[in-house]
């Protein structure tokens, strides 16, 4: 926010420069100009976070209703897992915000996994997937949990074999891809990716405010947005309409053996150690858990962590610096985050073949 000179100083300046009675008019004009500039700044900030009008789909895997229908069936089908009891929707449950509500995911044989299940909303705009960014497309990501030994524990060959044994899948694949031998690993992942790209957050109160409806959010949330984009520094990483930069940062959480993005860097490169992808704040769960491994159980704990600046180490993001926040400011920031929640869209479960 721009600094504004005290009124007496402004009046004295105006009297020297312009003289006499015109001074008051000049000061009034300066105040108006400052207010106009502030409104322009706010409008520019709103534009940065305004939701897009359409959903992107890659040319190599274009959107079709038939492909979405097939991908939806595959997403909810437990036959894609070795046990035959776990589907993608088991962990990415639409009733739980397309996650599972657990501190950490549970994998094959009910073995706890080291990371929390991320929601699958708004992935159409993503550029890197998984907490460590090891997948560069949704098509590549769709294969990973299926073939991971500690997740669904399947091979794509076995997936294809099982699907070919289900008579009802042949017409679904043929309608989606139109080839003589449509049931194949590439088509499985393409359909799953296409369906996931259709999972988009609904319009939230913040969106209506960003479009000009001043009554859509309260004064506390508006102050919270000013904190989010200003003093608190949240928008440095939680940017764009999805409130994520899709990048990777070490935010100073208590470290274990999980190096995150650093796993893919040479040992001599420390910058990416303990760096994980910035999660979206859209439809943020207000009851936790939070962070890539669910180690912070409440929003209050998250705020405390950022206020303290995280654990100091060479890889700590330069954005992580201690700062002070009053109780009112904390409430305002939470009030803003609550405006990012939309009413969950109703989803009809597919009739599996």
Swiss-Prot record:
<protein>
    <recommendedName>
        <fullName>Methylamine utilization protein MauG</fullName>
        <ecNumber>1.-.-.-</ecNumber>
    </recommendedName>
</protein>
<keyword id="KW-0479">Metal-binding</keyword>
<feature type="binding site" description="axial binding residue">
    <location>
        <position position="92"/>
    </location>
    <ligand>
        <name>heme c 1</name>
    </ligand>
</feature>
<feature type="binding site" description="covalent">
    <location>
        <position position="88"/>
    </location>
    <ligand>
        <name>heme c 1</name>
    </ligand>
</feature>
<dbReference type="InterPro" id="IPR026259">
    <property type="entry name" value="MauG/Cytc_peroxidase"/>
</dbReference>
<dbReference type="GO" id="GO:0005509">
    <property type="term" value="F:calcium ion binding"/>
</dbReference>
<dbReference type="GO" id="GO:0042597">
    <property type="term" value="C:periplasmic space"/>
</dbReference>
<keyword id="KW-0560">Oxidoreductase</keyword>
<dbReference type="InterPro" id="IPR004852">
    <property type="entry name" value="Di-haem_cyt_c_peroxidsae"/>
</dbReference>
<dbReference type="InterPro" id="IPR051395">
    <property type="entry name" value="Cytochrome_c_Peroxidase/MauG"/>
</dbReference>
<feature type="binding site" description="covalent">
    <location>
        <position position="234"/>
    </location>
    <ligand>
        <name>heme c 2</name>
    </ligand>
</feature>
<keyword id="KW-0732">Signal</keyword>
<keyword id="KW-0349">Heme</keyword>
<dbReference type="GO" id="GO:0004130">
    <property type="term" value="F:cytochrome-c peroxidase activity"/>
</dbReference>
<dbReference type="InterPro" id="IPR022394">
    <property type="entry name" value="Methylamine_utilis_MauG"/>
</dbReference>
<feature type="binding site" description="axial binding residue">
    <location>
        <position position="238"/>
    </location>
    <ligand>
        <name>heme c 2</name>
    </ligand>
</feature>
<dbReference type="Pfam" id="PF03150">
    <property type="entry name" value="CCP_MauG"/>
</dbReference>
<feature type="binding site" description="covalent">
    <location>
        <position position="237"/>
    </location>
    <ligand>
        <name>heme c 2</name>
    </ligand>
</feature>
<dbReference type="GO" id="GO:0030416">
    <property type="term" value="P:methylamine metabolic process"/>
</dbReference>
<dbReference type="GO" id="GO:0009055">
    <property type="term" value="F:electron transfer activity"/>
</dbReference>
<keyword id="KW-0249">Electron transport</keyword>
<dbReference type="InterPro" id="IPR009056">
    <property type="entry name" value="Cyt_c-like_dom"/>
</dbReference>
<dbReference type="InterPro" id="IPR036909">
    <property type="entry name" value="Cyt_c-like_dom_sf"/>
</dbReference>
<comment type="pathway">
    <text>One-carbon metabolism; methylamine degradation.</text>
</comment>
<feature type="binding site" description="covalent">
    <location>
        <position position="91"/>
    </location>
    <ligand>
        <name>heme c 1</name>
    </ligand>
</feature>
<keyword id="KW-0574">Periplasm</keyword>
<feature type="signal peptide">
    <location>
        <begin position="1"/>
        <end position="23"/>
    </location>
</feature>
<dbReference type="GO" id="GO:0020037">
    <property type="term" value="F:heme binding"/>
</dbReference>
<keyword id="KW-0408">Iron</keyword>
<feature type="binding site" description="axial binding residue">
    <location>
        <position position="292"/>
    </location>
    <ligand>
        <name>heme c 1</name>
    </ligand>
</feature>
<comment type="function">
    <text>Involved in methylamine metabolism. Essential for the maturation of the beta subunit of MADH, presumably via a step in the biosynthesis of tryptophan tryptophylquinone (TTQ), the cofactor of MADH.</text>
</comment>
<keyword id="KW-0813">Transport</keyword>
């Amino acid at each position: 926010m721009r600094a504004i000179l005290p009124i007496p100083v402004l009046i004295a300046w105006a009297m020297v420069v312009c003289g006499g009675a015109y001074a008051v008019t000049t000061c009034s004009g300066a105040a108006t100009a400052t207010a106009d500039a502030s409104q322009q700044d706010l409008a520019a900030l709103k534009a940065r976070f305004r939701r897009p009008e359409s959903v992107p789909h890659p040319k190599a895997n274009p959107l079709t209703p038939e492909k979405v229908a097939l991908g939806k069936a595959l997403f909810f089908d437990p036959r894609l897992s070795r046990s035959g009891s776990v589907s993608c929707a088991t962990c990415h449950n639409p009733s739980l915000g397309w996650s599972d509500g657990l501190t950490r995911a549970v994998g094959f044989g009910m073995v706890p996994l080291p990371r929390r299940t991320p929601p699958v909303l708004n992935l159409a705009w993503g550029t890197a997937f998984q907490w460590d960014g090891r997948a560069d497309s949704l098509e590549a990501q769709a294969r990973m949990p299926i073939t991971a030994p500690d997740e669904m524990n399947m091979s794509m060959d076995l997936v294809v074999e099982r699907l070919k044994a289900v008579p009802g899948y042949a017409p679904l694949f043929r309608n989606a891809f139109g080839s003589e031998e449509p049931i194949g690993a590439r088509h499985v992942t393409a359909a799953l990716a296409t369906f996931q790209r259709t999972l988009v957050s609904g319009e939230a109160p913040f969106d209506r405010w960003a479009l000009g409806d001043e009554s859509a959010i309260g004064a506390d949330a508006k102050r919270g947005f000013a904190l989010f984009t200003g003093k608190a520094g949240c928008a440095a990483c939680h940017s764009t309409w999805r409130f994520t930069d899709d990048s990777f940062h070490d935010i100073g959480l208590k470290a274990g053996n999980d190096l995150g993005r650093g796993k893919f860097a040479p040992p001599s490169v420390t910058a990416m150690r303990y760096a994980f992808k910035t999660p979206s704040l859209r439809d943020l769960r207000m009851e936790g858990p939070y962070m890539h491994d669910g180690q912070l159980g409440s929003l209050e704990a998250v705020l405390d962590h950022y206020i303290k600046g995280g654990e100091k180490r060479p890889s700590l993001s330069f954005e992580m610096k201690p700062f002070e926040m009053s109780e009112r400011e904390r409430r305002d920031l939470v009030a803003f985050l609550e405006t990012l929640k939309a009413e969950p869209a109703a989803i009809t479960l597919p009739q599996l073949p």
